Design a protein with these regions (language model features):
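Generic structural signal for short, flexible, solvent-exposed coil/loop and linker residues
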Residues: 8-12, 26, 39
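A short, exposed loop/beta-hairpin motif centered on an aromatic-Gly-Thr core
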Residues: 14-27
């Protein structure tokens, strides 16, 4: 498992946010971040846009 930073943009309130996630690959990291957005905010890709996924080098 690797550590990733997933950057998201809220298209309604116009702000950026970043999620640190542990995942197998960048696609999995994106999916984990989207699920966290849904769990934490009640919104997913209807309000947020994933803008970048970057692996964190240890």
């Amino acid at each position: 498992m690797k550590r990733y930073k997933v950057y998201v943009y809220n298209t309604v309130d116009k702000f950026w946010d970043c999620y640190d996630v542990i995942a197998e690959d960048p696609v999995d990291a994106r999916n984990v971040a989207v699920q966290r957005l849904i769990d934490e905010t009640g919104h997913g890709l209807d309000v947020y846009e994933v803008t970048d996924v970057c692996e964190v080098k240890e």
